[in-house]
Amino acid sequence: MIDSNFDIVLWVRMIKEGIEKKNLNPWDVNIAEIADYYIQKIKELKKFDIRLSADVILVAGILLRMKSEALYDECKVEEEEDYDYCDDYYDYDDIEEKPKKGKKKEKEDKDKNKKSKKPVTVDELIKTIEKELNKVKKSRKNREKKTNEVEEIIEELIEEDDISDIIAELLDDLMKEGIIVYQEKFKTREDRVRYFIPSLYLANDGKAELIQEKLFGELIIKLKSF
């Protein structure tokens, strides 16, 4: 018999299965428990050499982050409760009367914050994870696109020009000028890519020194005496 939920995305099925098996409240999901179940399930699937999609692995990371955030919030609540206990234990009436009213209001605010913590339903949890997944995928896609563009430019440049000619040309300019400010000398993206690898070659050969005081800051190519 085929499971009617088989067509549901694997990570969604795993979360729903975890809620059912651990007898969790679907209207107020315990993030820490579902994260632990999910990680354990992944370990079990890997034992059987089952190939897992990138989404399944990414969701594990998202759940772990959500678990750490939930535990941090719980610690903050417990810390506030400890302070409340100390305030109740010590009687400050003998010291000063006025702060008592402020302290009472502060306690009411803390109680209000604790009560205002909204429970997370299983549907809300799944929607939140889907949003996080889309963010990660979009970010990766943009990085891959930029990387591919640079690789294509480098390939085109290598096909068009012999890299040794570019190195010789750069060295000739460097011998005339002594110091080259990379971003000022090479204005276009194509030129910056074209001369970057030759700059590394010259530095590796001990003919030039590359200086960059700040990350992504001004790059200076300085001629070395040889």
Curated annotation (Swiss-Prot):
Keyword Hydrolase: no
Keyword Coiled coil in record: yes
Organism: Methanocaldococcus jannaschii (strain ATCC 43067 / DSM 2661 / JAL-1 / JCM 10045 / NBRC 100440)
Parts forming coiled coils: 121-163
Name assigned to this protein: Uncharacterized protein MJ1134
Keywords (A to Z) from UniProt: Coiled coil
